[in-house]
């Protein structure tokens, strides 16, 4: 089955690569319209997944990711329409030069070919990936989690109907709809057909893909994000930034997980932090250096563990540690961070510059929330993932990250001498 899907995807990718921007945009508009027109079918399928998820005692954060509503589906359809307004990178000339030989050389963006995506209980990913791959002329093979089985079937059926309406092969967007985990292991070996693999899920999924895939893998999305409050920070403003980074959307990979506080301000700042977090119903996981001052406020405070520093909370929980200075803060981030998004709150230009130079993360912020690490916020449009590695793509992956390039030489019967 998988080999047939791979062959069909490869064939479809050649067709997609020839489409004009107008043809691709038309297909996207049809997808968006059909998502709304077939709302009842999609939501009924999603309800089947929700019932099964509740019976399996899936946690609240996962249930929220899995849930589709009329409003959410409308927003997803609107997001697909927004992709139409994004600049098509395919065919763009990155650079070029005229060689001494007379050969005119260009480096031009082209589609990757076939993109594989493995993800968990996120039905929106099915549509996000499909729309971005279509815009960039790539075919896609999707493997969603068993939790989204019925929803993905319904959504992919809509997408394929739209593609066929626009005379595009339905195999351009395919989904593995069997929950058999052995199929994941086989998919990881399909380097003959899949050009790039993107896992969207927890650390275990990323580890599996890194260790077993023969396909180039883009890893990321694991966000143990830090903010360091320096001794010179504006503490009132710092509280606002911390609340935004932690509370706005705790389940996001760019939400704040560990707060580091300079020891010079800890006694005065931590009680204020505790009161602010209590108002937001955030539980604080405190080190021995932080716990006494935090308990002077109203928040629920518990002891932090070593494991807490290593994992994403993705909930209204926050680690708090007091550090000696900037050097210690950077050392902590190097030890426990995931190279996703880290921030410093400071009024010291030299400290800000040093933090930016020495913290090796995909996104580093000065006096700003880590929540900005997002394709839409960066002005890239939609994103297919957030990469925390350094090769091919780093940070939010917009349309450009779903392309590669080829060299094109124009001559006049030009010979190499």
UniProtKB/Swiss-Prot annotation:
A GO CC term attached to the entry: cytoplasm
Keyword NADP in record: yes
Chief localisation class: cytoplasm
Protein EC: 1.2.1.41
Superkingdom in the source lineage: Bacteria
One MF annotation (Gene Ontology) recorded for this entry: glutamate-5-semialdehyde dehydrogenase activity
Compartments where found: Cytoplasm
Residue spans crossing the bilayer: none
Family matches, as NCBIfam families: PRK00197.1 (NF001221), proA (TIGR00407)
Listed name of the protein: Gamma-glutamyl phosphate reductase
Species annotation: Proteus mirabilis (strain HI4320)
Gene (name only): proA
